[in-house]
């Protein structure tokens, strides 16, 4: 049910909840300087819009019209800009909408190719890599010049392209090709292609750029690739390390901020598997919720939050204790999450109900704070914090 159609009693209850919490328990909320700004940007695939949430005041700021079917979003780490990938129609071309975060308006549109579906930025925030699922390619976009500067051919239906922290490796998951393409982004040369990963999905690259992990979403495994580099004075090529057995339908990998374990959301097994990335071993598997589709680890590496698409509950799991702490009621069809910059709020995107559930993360108050309506079929979110000059 869409939040806009909730009965008035529900909306009144949400309002009282927000007022009560804000008035009585605000010790976990930061004190912001006057020039501080923070916004969460939510792509609404069914509306062709981006909902801008004012994080400081925890309210909807505005809706921005972007391109058709926005599906992904990224924030510049160095400039006050946000980039929205518009997938477009099935047979048409997509684009990137550039949002000026200081004024929250669209300032440019960068044309792409057929059905772009993901975006990743290099550490400097100057180059974007966009997977074009309908063109079997990856676009390389100069974000300062606001134009495509290269295009790499990859496998069939690429769904994600991730750049390593050292910017020396681009890892592309080809869903329909059941494969992973490894590219030298400086030259566009394909270094390796690894098959045998049914429904290859969004990769994770370790912070030291040594390994890539790719969930095989149409199977029950995670592919582990050792990325090219030097061991002593010897150059090592990209190589397949192993295929690890996890649950059925692994769709998302959540890496701890410290680069330690990885948590695999097994959507068809209703479970999460813990992976030790140094040894390529699968530890325990935990029953977690109905159709877990995304995980997010807290900044202190202690908690795992899991969005369950079919249960309307967010699961909270203690990594240190190895146990489920409980759950928080959110909206329908939870599909994406993002922390506020201070980590005191977790924004949960609810695709079916068309809203964002705002959850307080402090142990004393861990609960739903409020619900913010968005456009139709929201699907991705990013947080951007900065100080005005």
Q: PLM ranges: what are they?
A:
Residues 10-22:
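Bacterial N-terminal signal peptides
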Residues 2-3, 17, 208, 258:
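Intrinsically disordered, low-complexity regions enriched in Ser/Pro/Gly/Gln/His and often acidic
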Residues 2-12:
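Bacterial N-terminal signal peptides that target proteins for export
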Residues 24-389:
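Predominantly soluble domains enriched in secretory-pathway, periplasmic, or organellar proteins
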């Amino acid at each position: 049910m869409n939040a806009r159609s909730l009965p008035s009693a529900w909306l009144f209850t949400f309002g009282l909840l927000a007022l009560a919490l804000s008035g009585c328990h605000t010790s976990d909320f930061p004190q912001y300087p006057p020039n501080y700004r923070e916004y969460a940007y939510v792509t609404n695939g069914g509306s062709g819009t981006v909902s801008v949430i004012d994080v400081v005041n925890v309210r909807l700021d505005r809706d921005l019209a972007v391109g058709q079917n926005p599906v992904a979003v990224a924030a510049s780490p160095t400039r006050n800009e946000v980039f929205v990938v518009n997938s477009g129609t099935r047979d048409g071309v997509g684009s990137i909408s550039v949002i000026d975060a200081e004024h929250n308006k669209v300032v440019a549109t960068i044309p792409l190719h057929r059905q772009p579906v993901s975006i990743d930025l290099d550490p400097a925030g100057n180059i974007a890599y966009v997977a074009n699922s309908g063109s079997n390619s990856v676009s390389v976009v100069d974000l300062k010049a606001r134009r495509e500067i290269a295009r790499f051919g990859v496998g069939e239906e690429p769904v994600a392209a991730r750049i390593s922290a050292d910017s020396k490796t681009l890892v592309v998951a080809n869903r329909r090709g059941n494969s992973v393409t490894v590219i030298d982004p400086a030259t566009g040369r394909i270094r390796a292609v690894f098959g045998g990963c049914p429904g290859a999905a969004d990769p994770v690259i370790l912070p030291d750029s040594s390994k890539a992990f790719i969930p095989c979403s149409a199977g029950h495994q995670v592919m582990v690739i050792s990325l090219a580099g030097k061991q002593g004075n010897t150059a090592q090529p990209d190589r397949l390390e192993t295929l690890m057995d996890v649950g059925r339908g692994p769709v998302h990998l959540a890496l701890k901020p410290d680069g330690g374990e990885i948590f695999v959301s097994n959507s068809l097994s209703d479970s999460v598997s813990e992976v030790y990335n140094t040894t390529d071993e699968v530890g325990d598997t935990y029953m977690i919720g109905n159709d877990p589709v995304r995980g997010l680890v807290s900044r202190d590496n202690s908690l795992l939050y899991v969005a369950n698409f079919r249960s309307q509950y967010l699961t909270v799991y203690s990594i240190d204790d190895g146990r489920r702490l409980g759950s928080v009621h959110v909206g329908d069809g939870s599909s994406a999450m993002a922390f506020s910059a201070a980590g005191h709020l977790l924004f949960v995107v609810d695709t079916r109900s068309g809203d964002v559930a705002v959850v307080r993360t402090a142990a004393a108050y861990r609960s739903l704070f409020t619900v913010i309506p968005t456009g139709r079929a929201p699907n991705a979110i990013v947080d951007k914090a900065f100080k005005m000059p």
